[in-house]
């Protein structure tokens, strides 16, 4: 797991602040849940946190309970399986797959695109900036913001 750095997270939410309140969010590779929980604290109407690791899900569920984050749903599922059953687009999507697993990013984008689930802003994080730009071009996403911290590159894009 590669948690999103605090500085990167702060930059991201400065970008997203005008759009978060009342929106639906998907944190597909939730890990620590930092991105989804931050969105929930900023007034997102619904945040879905998805991860395939049972221990992570148990910790996320406990944190959601402690925070009394009633606008959060924690889902134990593989990303692909979850996306096959998703019904409607998300206003904000966070795609921050585990470190050194770029294929997960590509397959998640493929499923999101094919399912018509990208309803607004999408945050992508990876080790290689070129990969992010190539994926955005392939899936017809316009990059609105970029940032880098160390070896981690991030973009905010929209359809």
Where do the PLM segments sit?
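Class I S-adenosyl-L-methionine-dependent methyltransferase catalytic core
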Residues: 1-159
């Amino acid at each position: 797991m590669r948690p999103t750095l605090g500085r990167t997270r702060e930059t991201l939410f400065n970008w997203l602040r005008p759009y978060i309140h009342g929106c639906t969010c998907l944190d597909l590779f939730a890990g620590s849940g930092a991105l989804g929980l931050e969105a929930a604290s900023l007034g997102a109407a619904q945040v879905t946190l998805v991860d395939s690791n049972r221990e992570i899900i148990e910790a996320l569920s406990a944190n959601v309970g402690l925070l009394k984050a009633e606008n959060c749903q924690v889902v134990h599922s593989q990303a692909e399986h979850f996306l096959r059953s998703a019904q409607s687009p998300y206003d904000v999507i966070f795609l921050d797959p585990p470190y050194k697993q770029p294929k997960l990013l590509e397959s998640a984008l493929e499923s999101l695109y094919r399912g018509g689930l990208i309803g607004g802003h999408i945050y992508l994080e990876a080790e290689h900036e070129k990969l992010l730009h190539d994926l955005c071009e392939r899936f017809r996403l316009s990059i609105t913001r970029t940032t880098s911290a160390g070896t981690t590159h991030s973009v905010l894009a929209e359809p």
